[in-house]
Every structure is written in structure tokens, then in C-alpha cells.
């Protein structure tokens, strides 16, 4: 069976016709159907289908008008901002008025004044005026706190208030150094071992001779008289006076013409017991009697030994009498209560002495 693949022209009549692809002005045709180009054009900005050319021109005008509206809308805020800024600047310039003085009735010109007066609203004259009137109250301008205060807060003749002056003076004042010099009553409140000094004139030579603390406040008055020409200078010898032992100072002086003696008297306590005085004298005599150095100083010969012949006196005499015999260098001498020394029939004043220490 043979197939006839030849189709009838009636069946392929639609296929035999070639499509007309010739471009038409403003239209595209497919399969014999043609449509205007404007039918398939889309507005890229608005996304709307534009049917004909008249609508295209109308939409274009709308787009142009819309763009102009947007531009005008964007331009208006900028203009308003600039105008508002101009207004604020103008207001700022208008509000920057020249300050005036706070004092009642003062119309001073601050154009040539310093910034200090402009800031505190006071003219140069009223800043130094003692009394000004502000709102009916009498006040005064403080130079340090730069404010007006009542007159009660100021001292007379001061330009600053009392509060500021107090702080200012406290900062400026420095602590005064204490007086280094020794006061007159340096030994007034001293308690304990007493310092024994011997002097016969305007010069005072303190020594380190101290009494035994067990003696209490009782002091010793000793007088030694020296006679002879073997010593040409006034000297003073200390027996003991070292920290290890106690002793007494014996001033010795000589003069070729007259007999001089030296004494230093310190008051005894009036209520002292006689037994204490006796033990004190025994201590003094034992120290002098047992000392070889004292013998070498007081005597030119080693064989001559001074002896204590007279016993200690009672407390009422207020003196201790010491008598030395030997080579004739010393004579009887006693210290009386008035501070003078009696040697024989002659009362002699105390000469100047110089301390000499030995152990």
C-alpha cells in the first residue's frame, strides 16, 4: 500500500504563505496580523502600556510635569532652610546687645571697656566705688569674687569681701619659725640633777658638775680661800663631775696684795633633815681626802696633806665650812648666807673664774 505524502494544497495553504517580515512603519506583523508599534511599547519610567502616539506625548508631558514638581519640592526645603538660617543669624545679631552696668542710673558705654567689665556687667568706675545702689540696696563690688555684696561683708578700707580676704590671707601667710634663742627661764622647770655653775663676773662658764640625784633639791655652798703668790692666775678646779662619780668645784685664786676667796652659794631646803646634811658633808670630805690629784693641785709638797678639822655646821647656818691646813697656802674661809666670803677679818668679793675639769 503506497502512501501519498502529497498533501492537498488546501491543507497547506496556510503554511505555504511566507510570513511578511517587512517592517512596517510603527508596526510589527506576525502571520498576517499586524499591530502598531505603539501597542507594544512600554514606558520605562512609569511602566504603563501606551496605546498610541498621542497617549505617549501626553504621558511624556505628565512625566515632565512630575519631574518639575519633584525638583520644586526638593528645592523648597533648601530654600526654607537657608531662609531659616538667615533668620536665626539675623536674630543672633539682633539679640547681641551691649551689656549695661547693674548700678541704678548708670548708662556707661561698654564699647571700649574690657571684657572683664562686660562679662560681670559693671563699669570701671563702679567696680571701685565704695558704695553703689542696685535695686534700691546699698552694695559694693568685690574685686576678688567679682560680685556685688552687702556692705556688712566688707571690712573698712578693703576692696574684697571678708570671706575672700580670709582665704587669701590664709594662703599667703607662712608659719612663723619658733624662736631659737634660749629663754631666760630655761632651767626654771628643770627637775632632776642640778647644774652647778661658778662665775665671778659678767662671763658665765657652765660646768658639767652635777650633784647626786639622791640629794634631792639640796644644793651645796662651798668656799675655799687661797693665799700666796705661787699662783699668778685665777683658776677653777673641779673634783669629780664626771658621769662615773660626783664631786664639787673648788675655785682657787690668789693675789699678791690681798687674800681672795671664791664661793658659790645655793640655798638649802629649809625643811631638810640634819642627817641628810651630815651625810652630804661626809661625802664631800671623803671625796677630797681620798683624791691624790686634789693633793697634787692644792699642795706643793707631797708630804703635806690637808685635813678637815671642823665638823659640818647645822642647817640653820646654811653654809658648809671647809678648812685646809698644810703648807700655809690656805687659810680659814667660810661662806655665809649673804653670798660673801669671810677670810680672817676681810670680806672679799668673788672674782672671775674659769672652769677646769679633772677626773
Curated annotation (Swiss-Prot):
**Keyword check for Transmembrane helix:** no
Coiled-coil regions listed: none
CC cofactor: Zn(2+)
List the InterPro entries. SBP-like, SBP_dom, SBP_sf
What GO terms fall under cellular component here? Answer: nucleus
Q: Which domain of life is it from?
A: Eukaryota
Recorded hits in SUPFAM superfamilies, A to Z, give: SBT domain
- Reply yes or no: does the keyword Transcription regulation apply: yes
Record localization: Nucleus
Residues that, per the record, bind Zn(2+) 2: 142, 145, 149, 161
In its UniProt record, a GO molecular function of this protein is: zinc ion binding
- Induction annotation: Negatively regulated by microRNAs miR156 and miR157.
Mind listing the UniProt keywords for this protein, alphabetically? DNA-binding, Metal-binding, Nucleus, Transcription, Transcription regulation, Zinc, Zinc-finger
The processes (GO biological process) annotated in the record are: anther development; regulation of DNA-templated transcription
Can you quote the record's cofactor note? Answer: Binds 2 Zn(2+) ions per subunit.
- Chain ranges of zinc fingers (SBP-type): 98-175
User: Which residues are noted in the entry as Zn(2+) 1-binding?
Assistant: 101, 106, 123, 126
Chief location of this protein?
nucleus
| Placement of sequence motif Bipartite nuclear localization signal | 158-174
**Cited Pfam families:** SBP
Q: Which residue stretches belong to region Disordered? A: 75-94
Q: What is known of its domains?
A: The SBP-type zinc finger is required for the binding to DNA.
Annotated function: Trans-acting factor that binds specifically to the consensus nucleotide sequence 5'-TNCGTACAA-3'.
Name listed for the protein in its UniProt record: Squamosa promoter-binding-like protein 13A
Question: What organism, scientifically named, is this protein from?
Answer: Arabidopsis thaliana
Q: Which gene encodes it?
A: SPL13A
Amino acid at each position: 500500500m503506497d502512501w501519498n505524502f502529497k498533501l492537498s494544497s488546501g491543507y497547506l495553504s496556510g503554511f505555504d504563505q511566507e510570513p511578511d517580515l517587512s517592517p512596517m512603519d510603527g508596526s510589527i506583523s506576525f502571520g498576517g496580523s499586524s499591530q502598531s508599534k505603539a501597542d507594544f511599547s512600554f514606558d520605562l519610567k512609569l511602566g504603563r502600556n501606551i496605546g498610541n502616539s498621542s497617549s505617549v506625548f501626553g504621558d511624556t508631558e505628565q512625566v515632565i510635569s512630575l519631574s518639575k514638581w519633584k525638583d520644586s519640592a526638593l528645592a523648597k526645603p533648601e530654600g526654607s532652610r537657608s531662609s531659616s538660617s538667615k533668620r536665626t543669624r539675623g536674630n543672633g545679631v539682633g539679640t547681641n546687645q551691649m551689656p549695661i552696668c547693674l548700678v541704678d542710673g548708670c548708662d556707661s558705654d561698654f564699647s571700649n571697656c574690657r571684657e572683664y567689665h562686660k562679662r560681670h556687667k559693671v563699669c570701671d568706675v563702679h567696680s571701685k566705688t565704695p558704695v553703689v545702689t542696685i535695686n534700691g540696696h546699698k552694695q559694693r563690688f568685690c574685686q576678688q569674687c567679682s560680685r556685688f555684696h552687702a556692705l556688712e561683708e566688707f571690712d573698712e578700707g578693703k576692696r574684697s569681701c571678708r570671706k575672700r580676704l580670709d582665704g587669701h590671707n590664709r594662703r599667703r601667710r607662712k608659719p612663723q619659725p619658733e624662736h631659737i634663742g634660749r629663754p631666760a627661764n630655761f632651767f626654771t622647770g628643770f627637775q632632776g640633777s642640778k647644774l652647778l655653775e661658778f662665775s665671778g663676773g659678767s662671763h658665765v662658764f657652765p660646768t658639767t658638775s652635777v650633784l647626786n640625784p639622791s640629794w634631792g633639791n639640796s644644793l651645796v655652798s662651798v668656799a675655799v680661800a687661797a693665799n700666796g703668790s705661787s699662783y699668778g692666775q685665777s683658776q677653777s678646779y673641779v673634783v669629780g663631775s664626771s658621769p662615773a662619780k660626783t664631786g664639787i668645784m673648788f675655785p682657787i685664786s690668789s693675789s699678791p696684795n690681798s687674800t681672795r676667796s671664791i664661793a658659790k652659794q645655793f640655798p638649802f631646803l629649809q625643811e631638810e633633815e640634819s642627817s641628810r646634811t651630815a651625810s652630804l658633808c661626809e661625802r664631800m670630805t671623803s671625796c677630797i681626802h681620798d683624791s691624790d690629784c686634789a693633793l697634787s693641785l692644792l699642795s706643793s709638797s707631797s708630804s703635806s696633806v690637808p685635813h678637815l678639822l671642823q665638823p659640818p655646821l647645822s642647817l640653820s647656818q646654811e653654809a658648809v665650812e671647809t678648812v685646809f691646813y698644810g703648807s700655809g697656802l690656805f687659810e680659814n674661809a667660810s661662806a655665809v648666807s649673804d653670798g660673801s666670803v669671810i677670810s680672817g677679818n676681810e670680806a672679799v668679793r668673788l672674782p672671775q673664774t674659769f672652769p677646769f675639769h679633772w677626773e
